[in-house]
Amino acid sequence: MSPVRRWGSPCLFPLQLFSLCWVLSVAQSKTVRYSTFEEDAPGTVIGTLAEDLHMKVSGDTSFRLMKQFNSSLLRVREGDGQLTVGDAGLDRERLCGQAPQCVLAFDVVSFSQEQFRLVHVEVEVRDVNDHAPRFPRAQIPVEVSEGAAVGTRIPLEVPVDEDVGANGLQTVRLAEPHSPFRVELQTRADGAQCADLVLLQELDRESQAAYSLELVAQDGGRPPRSATAALSVRVLDANDHSPAFPQGAVAEVELAEDAPVGSLLLDLDAADPDEGPNGDVVFAFGARTPPEARRLFRLDPRSGRLTLAGPVDYERQDTYELDVRAQDRGPGPRAATCKVIVRIRDVNDNAPDIAITPLAAPGAPATSPFAAAAAAAALGGADASSPAGAGTPEAGATSLVPEGAARESLVALVSTSDRDSGANGQVRCALYGHEHFRLQPAYAGSYLVVTAASLDRERIAEYNLTLVAEDRGAPPLRTVRPYTVRVGDENDNAPLFTRPVYEVSVRENNPPGAYLATVAARDRDLGRNGQVTYRLLEAEVGRAGGAVSTYVSVDPATGAIYALRSFDYETLRQLDVRIQASDGGSPQLSSSALVQVRVLDQNDHAPVLVHPAPANGSLEVAVPGRTAKDTVVARVQARDADEGANGELAFELQQQEPREAFAIGRRTGEILLTGDLSQEPPGRVFRALLVISDGGRPPLTTTATVSFVVTAGGGRGPAAPASAGSPERSRPPGSRLGVSGSVLQWDTPLIVIIVLAGSCTLLLAAIIAIATTCNRRKKEVRKGGALREERPGAAGGGASAPGSPEEAARGAGPRPNMFDVLTFPGTGKAPFGSPAADAPPPAVAAAEVPGSEGGSATGESACHFEGQQRLRGAHAEPYGASPGFGKEPAPPVAVWKGHSFNTISGREAEKFSGKDSGKGDSDFNDSDSDISGDALKKDLINHMQSGLWACTAECKILGHSDRCWSPSCSGPNAHPSPHPPAQMSTFCKSTSLPRDPLRRDNYYQAQLPKTVGLQSVYEKVLHRDYDRTVTLLSPPRPGRLPDLQEIGVPLYQSPPGRYLSPKKGANENV
């Protein structure tokens, strides 16, 4: 079909041509009109835009509907803009109803590289004669009075024909040519058709009371279509005068659209010359008056006054036609009708409307809001998204434009309209808010919103614009519409890490799965473009070439880094991991950061003895017997895989047996001879425990047993090879090697300091000795003197006394053994009853006291138990029973515990406690500590004892006495020894009675009753009548407790009548 171009009158042609050229130069837009018939087959070509617009079509040219349109009605081919009928076809009656003209209007955009063009297309759908007229009813009854005048019109029901124009209803006639009636078909001012039965001659009911006629309705199609209906006319005999309107059959009224409700339009004063009820006229709207008119206008039934009942709107309807019927009330009332035409006068009461249609994206679904708005605009209806329908602007609109859009890109189509007429309906539009967008005229009442600059969503994500439309009325009305343009995100930003390098520290031996750190990257884009995921970049780690993914892992969502294995500082000290952050855009952008994982050392390696190599945890060093003191006899080398303080090694010799004769450099590992081995026989073995520890917290240690074997000869024994930088080789003349292995330089300031320190030490020791002696003498004077007993059979010099260990070893014969307590040599104190002159020479005492060297006491002693075969004092270890041990000799203190006596060693008689009792200083029965000595029971007793302490032959006659329950303390020793035999007080350890050997507890305290025999001992305790010799106990290595037969106890003479005779077998039952 060729396009229909209507250029108007010749006088307006130059003006239209000028306007067309101006529009083409600015917007490159044009209006094209086509026409087609309804019921055309789907696919029928209506026209081609490219040909009709004389456009050169290239490969990049495309035509697209500006708004989403119902493709079932019309289709636009994208390549050349060819318009065709859709699959559903075009039905004019369904699209436009009874409208005289049916036009489909829409906009098409032509895109190319050079420019884009907006084409306004109007397609007129022409009617075809596809519908025949039809009567509402097949039988139509009509009544007419016999007194009706010629020309009386009787309304008939109009046939309906859905076609319009020439194809619509054209004629309605009677089939009988000779009848007193004629049917006339008229068209009203509003376009509606009406049919009247016109009386051609007077009627006489008496001659013919009814007429049966046939109505024929015919349209103007080719060929024409027709329909018939039966018409029954009944002639009534009644009132012969009808009411008459003074205005005639037609009355016209003009009404302003802003007239208030209740305004009078017309006074219909109809008169009837008849009298009585035949002349009483009643007014009413005729049957053809539409319901809308009945709602807007009110007719008084008695007076005939026509008033305004509701507001009218010129833009909605500008003309109303009312049928008013006046009827009398006589029998067979007569009626007259009057047609009232109400014309509405326009005023400027409507503000302009603004409709914003964003550019629809290709392939947008038809259910989207943009598609619904476009379809509604194309069909000429109201905006589907507007709740108030047509004429109500939306509160705001939103468009979406990508941030990568070029300048002059189309954003939206703005359409303005005003329902007023004339100058009141002329609208102008403007855009405010930002210079990045501007408004460009498109065609009449329409504008294009285009970009005026490049956009960046990261800088401005949303533009708030304002559209203002104003008409030219007096006064003008204005509409302000907010408009939002949101910038769509594109993937133009790569993720960025907060730091290029992350430093992380982790201790070695971490558990697998341990958390290390979290890296964070930010992407300024939105949605998937800003969704950051993390991953490891593969690389080889260390010399082994393992993949970094076997060491650590990263959470793709959070960036948290976890260890997959336990790290070892000795094999891997730093792990460089490169993390890549990628977004979810297309194309994908990424960046990376370096994570340096530093492994911190832990003390997880114990020292390893390297040289000499141990055999089963033992070392053997041969030392010549004539080796000089401070000579390096061996060098110990060890290594530790840890570093720093964890790898710093310290050497120490512990548990040297039988005495301390060697020392080791704490840092160098050089073992020096510190004792004299010249008197040791070859083969003598000195054992020590070598402890090598590192500087960790806690430290790790390695131990080995070192055996020093004394060999014959004067040279040095084999030692570890000294390194070139060892202290022995690098010692300058005049210096000596210390125990720690460091070289000491004997310079003058050092000598002065040593001399001064030694002098001060000697002076302090002398002051302490004098004060101690004076204090002791004051106490002895205060007590009235010490009890001293002569030792019978004491021999001078160093001769062995009868009963001594040496004599027992030579086989001097059987004798009772004794319990001797060694004292510190040189203290000046002797046992009970023995003068100080009776003390053995220092050489003899030194030979018996362990740890003494060269006849000088070491300051330590031990509890020495003398047995039948040999003395075991050589293996006893020193132990002080009081906190002041080693400072001052302390006397033993005896305390009655309620069931047994216990002895302790204290510095003073009133200071035998080492802890607070919780009582006050003046409390009755105050005791500062538990002095029972129970902690030493199991250390002092190594094996079970059988029998009592001091049973004699007298016990068989007189029974057991108190002496049987306690050892001898005050009696003289009949068998002197070469040592100072300190008498044993009865206030010693709690006596123990034998128990079942299978029991776990091998002793219990014996209950000692207060007898006359023990009363003397108890009084001695109260008067502090005891020896001040220090008694030292040795818990680690106690000798065995003497048996009953081995204890020499003097006979105790019990007073007669003191005890009853024991029963037979009492001795065995104890």
From Swiss-Prot:
Residues 782-792, 907-922 have a biased composition (Basic and acidic residues). Pfam families: Cadherin (PF00028), Cadherin_2 (PF08266). Keywords: Calcium, Cell adhesion, Cell membrane, Cell projection, Glycoprotein, Membrane, Phosphoprotein, Postsynaptic cell membrane, Repeat, Signal, Synapse, Transmembrane, Transmembrane helix. It comes from the Eukaryota. Its main location: membrane. SUPFAM superfamilies: Cadherin-like (SSF49313). It is found in: Cell membrane; Cell projection, Dendrite; Presynaptic cell membrane; Postsynaptic cell membrane. Glycans are attached at N70, N464, N616. Residues 30-135, 136-245, 247-354, 393-497, 498-609, 615-723 form the Cadherin domain. InterPro entries: Cadherin-like_dom (IPR002126), Cadherin-like_sf (IPR015919), Cadherin_CS (IPR020894), Cadherin_N (IPR013164), Protocadherin/Cadherin-CA (IPR050174). Residues 382-399, 718-736 have a biased composition (Low complexity). Calcium-dependent cell-adhesion protein. May play a role in activity-induced synaptic reorganization underlying long term memory. Could be involved in CDH2 internalization through TAOK2/p38 MAPK pathway. In hippocampal neurons, may play a role in the down-regulation of dendritic spines, maybe through its action on CDH2 endocytosis. This is Protocadherin-8. It comes from Homo sapiens (Human). The gene is PCDH8.
